[in-house]
């Protein structure tokens, strides 16, 4: 069973977070941008988002953040929450957990979200007033991914494509 580490203000970001960011940075940024838009729509504006699936540049179908939350809701018996958060000089670091009570699985995820986000082609940085909400949602998303069986995710992708058409 995973153990939790609480990071105090001033601690370095865990190496795994740095490694994840280093792998496929562009694909990661595209996925993050898509998820950030949905976080704002879903959690802050309370809009209904029908797009649960999208196709990556590698031509693979994957779930959006909305799709992951919907899969957790339909799977049932998934408890999700925020364990810890801290504000650093330039970002939020949020730790979330997910418990699959049916299968007795537990996972934690840590996400770092910068206060400033690039805008447009020039990449000038502007203050992101939703950075804390984004960090929470991304941490929950990452925790949920590990406690629901992969075959269930795949069957839900097929169902979402059939019912909602998905985003290509």
Where are these regions (language model features)?
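Polyanion-binding surfaces on beta-sheet-dominated domains and ring/shell assemblies
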Residues: 1-168
């Amino acid at each position: 069973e995973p153990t939790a580490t609480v990071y105090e203000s001033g601690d370095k970001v865990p190496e795994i977070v740095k490694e994840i960011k280093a792998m496929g940075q562009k694909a990661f940024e595209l996925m993050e941008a898509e998820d950030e838009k949905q976080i704002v729509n879903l959690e802050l504006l309370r809009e209904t988002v029908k797009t649960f699936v999208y196709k990556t540049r590698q031509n693979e179908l994957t779930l959006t953040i909305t799709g992951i939350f919907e899969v957790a809701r339909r799977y049932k018996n998934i408890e999700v929450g925020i364990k810890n958060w801290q504000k650093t000089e330039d970002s939020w670091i949020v730790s979330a957990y997910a418990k699959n009570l049916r299968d007795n699985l537990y996972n934690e995820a840590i996400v770092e979200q910068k206060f400033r986000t690039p805008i447009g082609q020039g990449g000038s940085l502007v203050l992101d007033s939703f950075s804390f909400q984004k960090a929470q949602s991304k941490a929950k998303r990452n925790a949920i991914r590990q406690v629901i069986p992969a075959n269930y995710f795949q069957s839900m992708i097929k169902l979402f494509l059939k019912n909602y058409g998905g985003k290509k």
